[in-house]
Amino acid sequence: MNNERIYQVLKGPVFSEKAQVLGDTAGVQVFKVDINATKLEIKKAVEKLFGVEVVKVNTTITKGKTKRFGRTLGRRSDVKKAYVTLKAGQDVEMADLGDTAESAAE
């Protein structure tokens, strides 16, 4: 897998209460991924990008909602999320957004 495909597969982390609880208790990291990405591609991308060992990958596809824009109906895009279980004792280093917001306010 080349570097370009890695960045196409992993779109970014999911920052939510559920994702944070899973990360703290079960060692699971949650990522938004490409809708066509396979579990094997996701596993290889996380291992290569973050240098951790992946135990398993679970995925979900959330269907986009139908929204009204004036008289016309539109539809939001479908989103695929990957729940990546890491080997015990390993963690993915991500930027803490809370610190940057506080330093920007000063």
From Swiss-Prot:
Q: Which InterPro entries match?
A: Nucleotide-bd_a/b_plait_sf, Ribosomal_uL23-like, Ribosomal_uL23/eL15/eS24_sf
Is the keyword Ribosomal protein in the record? yes
A Pfam family: Ribosomal_L23
Which GO molecular-function terms appear in the entry?
rRNA binding; structural constituent of ribosome
Gene Ontology cellular-component annotations: ribonucleoprotein complex; ribosome
Q: What keywords is this UniProt entry annotated with?
A: Ribonucleoprotein, Ribosomal protein, RNA-binding, rRNA-binding
Superkingdom of source:
Bacteria
Give GO terms for biological process: translation
Please describe the quaternary structure of this protein: Part of the 50S ribosomal subunit. Contacts protein L29, and trigger factor when it is bound to the ribosome.
Q: Which HAMAP family match?
A: Ribosomal_uL23_B
Q: What is the protein's known function?
A: One of the early assembly proteins it binds 23S rRNA. One of the proteins that surrounds the polypeptide exit tunnel on the outside of the ribosome. Forms the main docking site for trigger factor binding to the ribosome.
UniProt similarity note = Belongs to the universal ribosomal protein uL23 family.
What protein name is recorded for this chain? Large ribosomal subunit protein uL23
Q: Which organism is it from?
A: Acinetobacter baumannii (strain AB0057)
The UniProt gene name for this protein comes to rplW
